Regions:
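Mg2+-dependent phosphoryl-transfer enzymes with acidic/Ser/Thr/Gly-rich catalytic loops
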Residues: 3-12, 29, 205-287
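Short, acidic loop-to-helix structural element flanking the phosphoryl-transfer center
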Residues: 26-43, 90-97, 150-152, 210-224, ...
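Asp-based phosphoryl-transfer active-site loop
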Residues: 9-26, 101, 244
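Short, structured coil segments at secondary-structure junctions
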Residues: 65-67, 75, 186-188, 246-247, ...
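Short active-site oxyanion
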Residues: 43-48, 67-69, 166, 229-230, ...
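Conserved acidic, metal-coordinating active-site core of Asp-based
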Residues: 118-232, 238
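Anion (oxyanion) recognition and catalysis
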Residues: 37-41, 106, 184, 245, ...
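Active-site phosphate-binding/coordination module
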Residues: 30-138
């Protein structure tokens, strides 16, 4: 059976993690894990994830999945090869842009994290200035991770010989939107993404990459590499819209933001019902 005239075995399936593939406990359910392993193993499906997360948390989350394709991580600024345990296809922010972005944060009295690739597998995260309770929890939950190391109270946090992949901040969504508008107006050498926290809409996240970086661009790059003739993408949040629009077929979970469901080809069940894995399995079986 063919879908849109394309053999489904050459379909690349790409899912966001938080709010989409993960449950509300921010983990993969046992049902999703077993279904994904059947998709990859028995059915020969081409599956991966595209996420704002770093390998430091993606690798533990995906450890039971028999992944064969690179993960698209850090909002598309890198891929992670789970077979080799190493970064691939990194897109660094030049140091002049890092300085320009940090200047904008200074004007707004905000203090970002700068994520830098250290070697082929480590991520060094630099920060200077006070941290909110939310940021303190964020750091505490990640201090033990084997693929990430924090450098806090780093007076020279802007500068390093390591490649900068991401400048990141968490704050009230309205505050971050103002900073994002300033960045778009004054720093043309960066890409800016601001979106809501799925657990509290008044809170948000701001991500800055080198210009042209996105999950959408990384997905299209991976599709070319694996020879996929059809791309299906799953998402829930505003930062998923571009990759959904770049897909041949886009799928929103029921719990997605209204703006996401409005542009999707199809809306399926919620993230709490293993909906993404079940949809992919059914799509492959029908072929």
């Amino acid at each position: 059976m063919m879908a849109n005239g394309v053999e489904k075995s050459r379909t690349l399936y790409v899912s966001d993690l938080d709010g989409t593939l993960l449950g509300d406990d921010s983990r993969l359910s046992a049902e999703t894990v077993s279904t994904l392993n059947r998709i990859i193993g028995e059915l020969g499906g081409l599956f991966t994830v595209a996420t704002a997360r770093t390998p430091a948390t993606v690798v533990p989350l995906m450890q039971q999945v028999h992944a064969r394709l690179p993960y698209i991580v850090i909002g598309g600024s890198a891929m992670w090869n789970p077979m080799l345990g190493a970064y691939e296809h990194t897109h660094g922010i030049d140091e002049a842009t890092v300085d320009a972005v940090a200047d904008v944060f200074d004007r707004h009295g905000a203090y970002p994290f700068i994520y830098r690739r250290h070697g082929n597998s480590m991520l060094h995260t630099h920060h200077y200035g006070p941290m909110s309770a939310q940021e303190q929890r964020f750091v505490a939950e990640r201090q033990h991770l084997s693929l990430k190391r924090f450098f806090l109270n780093d007076r020279d946090y802007r500068h390093s010989d390591d490649e900068a992949l991401l400048i990141f901040s968490m704050n009230k969504y309205a505050t971050l939107s103002t900073i994002a508008d300033d960045l778009r107006a004054t720093v043309p050498t960066c890409s800016v993404m601001v979106y809501h926290d799925i657990f509290e809409e008044s809170e948000g996240f701001l991500e800055i990459f080198t210009a042209g970086t996105s999950k959408a661009a990384a997905i299209l790059c991976l599709a070319r590499e694996v020879g996929a003739a059809r791309v299906v993408v799953f998402g829930d949040n505003l930062n998923d819209i571009a990759m959904l629009q770049a897909a041949d077929y886009s799928v929103a979970v029921e719990n997605a933001f209204p703006e996401v469901k409005a542009i999707a080809s199809e809306v399926i069940g919620p993230n709490t019902a293993h909906s993404v894995a079940h949809w992919i399995e059914a799509d492959l079986i029908q072929s």
